[in-house]
Amino acid sequence: MGMAFYLGVLALIISSYFPIMASTVTPTTLVDTSSLNRSSFPKGFIFGTGSSSYQYEGAANEGGRGQSIWDNYTHKYSDKILDRSNGDVAVDQYHRYKDDVAIMKYMNTDAYRFSISWPRILPKGKVSAGINKEGIKYYNNLINELLDNGLVPFVTLFHFDLPQALQDKYNGFLSSDIINDFRDYAELCFKEFGDRVKHWITINEPHSHSTIGTEAPYIASYNQLLAHAAAVKLYRTNYQVSQKGSIGITLNCIWFLPFSNDILDHQAAHRALDFMFGWFMEPLTKGKYPQSMVSLVGKRLPKFTKKQSKMLIGSFDFIGINYYTSSFAANIPHSKNDTSKPTYFKDTHVNLTTERNGAPIGPRAASPWLYVYPRGIRELLLYTKTKYNNPLIYITENGMDEFNDPTLSLEEALMDTYRIDYFYRHLYYISSAIKHGVKVKGYFAWSLLDNFEWSAGYTLEIKRLKRRCGTVIATKVLNQMELKGDIMRFLSEFHRNGRLGKGPVTNVEYNVPTLIRYVNVATNVPTLY
């Protein structure tokens, strides 16, 4: 989950001080979703699944690929990863992409969102330093395999795995030098793949990369926005007319509810939205930062020139939104006696909590930060419609993780009831938002496969329980993958325009044959049984 990159640090802090209960999400019947199916969405609405290169591909040292910052980080600081793992093999999509596409086809999905590994096609990060033809060939093969199976590729250009060479050369997104290098990298992708790729996402979750991945979040976000705008300008000038594609950016956001009816807590909730969502949406729509950020951050917030503002305004055909959870927001009063160094999180003057008056905002998933609040996605969509002139939107990530319970049989574990409930309720509220005029054009479940989840690694080991977030179980220790029966049938039937019975989704039972895939990790040679 991309959001885990942002909230992982907070989760670690929470888990260090509070015992984490090994209870899974308990579905609650809040709304009648029994009539929800594919026809509940507009004609042409896209359903798909998502992934990212470092979390999926593996083959870290194959095919001429250069090192990314995540290769360096996981090897140099393995103690920072909960299971001390890395993405060297990941779920081996580099070798097994045909198998994965076959699963997508079985699920009757329309599209697949994946990211290109910048260092796989530009090992040194710069076009002038050499293009890796093997990397180009891999993505051509993946794109062609998707199209041959009736799946639409949605391609993200940057999903956290920056070339280490650029980090070493000028500190990555903390330098304005990256703007031209990103533009050149994007142009290479447009040239090589744009005849078949019609949906481009420049950057995934700039908020996450800025606040957790760098030491100077305001500078990093500034350069990410300008790199995005430069790539969009180039695409629109040189490629969009002939290639007939669209381009946008993906932003992550939590929905924030006021902790109380106090006006200060209501202001805190709005301020939290400004600092997480408005930080990027305001420049993209108005060419400037939210006033709350300007007032609280002051001179530490880089200013856009008039030329930059003009380039930023409207630099998207669509906005991708990654939504997982919601939180209560309480005001933190200003203190004149605070002489400590300012930080992004302190600048907000907001205390975020998932509990109010002893009651959680919703059932908790496996991750300490992920509390299930489906209505939040509707509220966020309506907020975006009202505040930002109703842009075209794709839900580019939405999903949950849950604990593996070692007491369950394989058949019971594959039922995946809670994830079905999570998806169904979020789809219900998305459908409701569409009926209220929000222009949502597609939905991508996170994730196709259990995968390397950044600081959580492949598993979150808590009392010998492991968390999973994919529609396919990927067991690294046993080197196998298994389709989760009920969730696979749910997706397959839903996408066929089927209904899931007359009662709540939590009462549905299906029996799907289990597909087991084994990988010889020593040789990375996949076998499908």
Tell me the role of every PLM-derived stretch.
Residues A4-A11, S15-I81, Y106, K124-V127, ...:
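Active-site region of glycoside hydrolase catalytic domains
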Residues L478-G498:
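Conserved N-lobe beta3->alphaC-helix segment of eukaryotic protein kinase catalytic domains
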Residues L12-I13, V472, D486, L515:
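Generic short N-terminal amphipathic or hydrophobic helices
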Residues L82-H95:
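Active-site mouth loops of central-metabolism enzymes
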Residues L465-Q480:
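Glycine-rich ATP phosphate-binding loop
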Residues T506-R517, V521-Y529:
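Intrinsically disordered, low-complexity segments enriched in serine/proline and basic residues
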